[in-house]
Amino acid sequence: MPGSKIFSLEGKGLKLDTAEDIEPHIKELRDNADVEEVRFLGNTLGIGASEALAKVLETKKKLQVANFADIFTGRLLSEIPTALSHLLTSLLTLPNLYTVNLSDNAFGLNTQAPLVDFLSKHVPLRHLILNNNGLGPAAGVLVADALTALAEKKDAARKDGQDVPYLETIICGRNRLENGSMAAWAKAYAAHTGIKEVKMVQNGIRQEGITHLLTNGLSHSAKLETLDLQDNTFTATGAKALSNVVGGWADLKELGVGDCLLSRRGGISLAAALAKGKNPKLEVLRLQFNEINSKGVAGLADAHTKLPALRRVELNGNQFDEDDAGLAKLRDALEERKDAADGKGEDDEEYWGIDELEDLESEDEDEEEDDDEAKKGSDDEDEGVEVEEKAARELLAAEQAEQQNVPQEKDKKVDDLADALAKTQIK
């Protein structure tokens, strides 16, 4: 009788330190040759337990999905790299493992090495989920560099006649990637041309970094279906870059740029870009809290005829009145589409129409955007990002040098102490 295709210890809150601790919990997994998905999220694994689990995992050649989110809560920084290395080294032996979730684990500079090694080598990878890992820009550079190296390995394998999947999904939010890692991420996206889903929310990326990411990286993602960059900072500069590249995403279904400070000018620019009719599959627009005014809303209302699949637009927190004419036009158009959809999505309040407009602001007629910012040249923006990337790499080099020097300094102190003791005579 075949075993279950899913093995799960999800959310059990187990504290598994040693091989002996974990053995009773993975006996069923050990005996299951047909398992395709494992879920260990919500438990905490020590070095011994991770090593024992790794030995079992490397025998599961049918495994496709590994969920190791939140598996190091309460662990010392000195434990995590070794434990993680055991697990990820075993995953490298699995030819069908295409989805890996490592969210909610601390992978800063001190613990990133096993992750970076795995990402640079695991050719079968299709879907990578790295949310809330505390990377920071320096470790973010390393992760992006690893993905660029992975693209090279995938290409080399294809040239050897192997059937190799494209990397399709990167979810890397709440990681403080900032501007300092955007040049590296742009290179990674440019290398992985099969990307379909990108979610990089809440990363502290400013307009220069956003512009670089879009212009030099995601502009190469012709197969992109979902882009979520919410809660980063665009301003008119980033909105202009988005407007310039969005037409290249003919398969785009969902665009999330809420809480990104697109600005009034940016809202108008994006609406004009969408009105060109190059995004026929676009279904969802998330544009909340962006200072979009009535002109921007009017632009979206006019653009809807060029967006035949559009069903949901989120506009709360922007700068127009609830009785705005453009808003009414857009709402009516979406309502007509809902009526024509024969009940599709009717059980989901957020599937159709406009979101709840509870936090609208009045448009400030005296507010003037900085024209100089909107007219900044791309050369200046690229230079700024390159400077910040250099700083991130210098921080990384300094951190690595410090880690290498610590043992040497300790050894020197031990030697000095030994010399002093050797000179001491008992009287």
Provide a role label for each language-model segment.
Residues 1-427:
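Leucine-rich tandem repeat or coiled-coil scaffolds
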